[in-house]
Amino acid sequence: MKNLNLYHFFDCKDRKITMYRLTEKGERIRDMFSDIAPRYDFLNRLLSFGVDRRWRRNAVKCIRWSEGGRVLDVATGTGDVALEIARQTPPSVAIVGVDFSEGMVALGRDKVAGSPYAGRITMEIAPCEAIPFPDDTFDSVTIAFGIRNVVDRSQGLSEMLRVLKPGGRAVILEFSTPRSRLFKRIYSFYFLRVLPVIGGLFSQFGAYKYLPDSVLEFPSQEEFKALMASVGFRDTAHRDQTFGIATIYTGEKGLK
């Protein structure tokens, strides 16, 4: 019987297969996203008033690509970022999406199959902490609204760095807390009081209670950039989106 909590990746340095097992918390998060997968896209549009699409477009504008190259989208969910990458890059660029939720990947594959980009996008089941590709494979690696759900963030970021080509770029889109006092109060009321209730009407209350809690626990912008630098990313930077509700982080892999 297949162990759904055990993953592997190829360690090019030691030329061996390395095994990675999800923690109990990681299992709970994965199962939660599989449960809400059928309503995930609808609720994203509803709860963000559609602005999440603009954030994703802005994030994809930050990637690097080359003719005949490859781009990886981690925590790809139902494939929104993978599809946006396909829209913004030429047909020679191949896109791979990985996610640890089988439910999300199943929906993503269906969405991709019905798009004009079916021949360019492949999707696989894997967590951020164990990306199943060799070193120096991708021009860019993206992750949108997923890094806060990675239990071992240092390991996840290290994996993203590992599979980047020298000179490649990681682009990370994540929720953040606005710095304006007035906007922070409005945002906090909506995020902590309204969002879980609306989410609960259409899906699981617990899942949309987890969302604001996980955002509040996420490091500050400067702290997260420091974490990126600590695993080896260079030239880390960030850009606020919509008054700081979300942030785009970028970091690069040094040339060898």
UniProtKB/Swiss-Prot annotation:
MF-aspect GO terms: 2-methoxy-6-polyprenyl-1,4-benzoquinol methyltransferase activity; demethylmenaquinone methyltransferase activity
Transmembrane segments: none
Catalytic function, reaction form: a 2-demethylmenaquinol + S-adenosyl-L-methionine = a menaquinol + S-adenosyl-L-homocysteine + H(+); a 2-methoxy-6-(all-trans-polyprenyl)benzene-1,4-diol + S-adenosyl-L-methionine = a 5-methoxy-2-methyl-3-(all-trans-polyprenyl)benzene-1,4-diol + S-adenosyl-L-homocysteine + H(+)
Keyword S-adenosyl-L-methionine appears in the UniProt entry: yes
Biological pathway: Quinol/quinone metabolism; menaquinone biosynthesis; menaquinol from 1,4-dihydroxy-2-naphthoate: step 2/2; Cofactor biosynthesis; ubiquinone biosynthesis
Disulphide connectivity of cysteines: none
Keyword Nucleotide-binding part of the UniProt annotation: no
GO BP term, pick one: ubiquinone biosynthetic process
Entries under InterPro entries matching the protein: SAM-dependent_MTases_sf, UbiE/COQ5_MeTrFase, UbiE/COQ5_MeTrFase_CS
Residues involved in S-adenosyl-L-methionine binding: 78, 99
Keywords attached to this entry: Menaquinone biosynthesis, Methyltransferase, S-adenosyl-L-methionine, Transferase, Ubiquinone biosynthesis
The EC number(s) this enzyme carries: 2.1.1.163, 2.1.1.201
Pfam family, one: Ubie_methyltran
Function of the molecule: Methyltransferase required for the conversion of demethylmenaquinol (DMKH2) to menaquinol (MKH2) and the conversion of 2-polyprenyl-6-methoxy-1,4-benzoquinol (DDMQH2) to 2-polyprenyl-3-methyl-6-methoxy-1,4-benzoquinol (DMQH2).
UniProt similarity note: Belongs to the class I-like SAM-binding methyltransferase superfamily. MenG/UbiE family.
PANTHER family tied to this protein: 2-METHOXY-6-POLYPRENYL-1,4-BENZOQUINOL METHYLASE, MITOCHONDRIAL, METHYLTRANSFERASE
Protein name: Ubiquinone/menaquinone biosynthesis C-methyltransferase UbiE
Organism expressing this protein natively: Geobacter sulfurreducens (strain ATCC 51573 / DSM 12127 / PCA)
Encoding gene, per UniProt annotation: ubiE
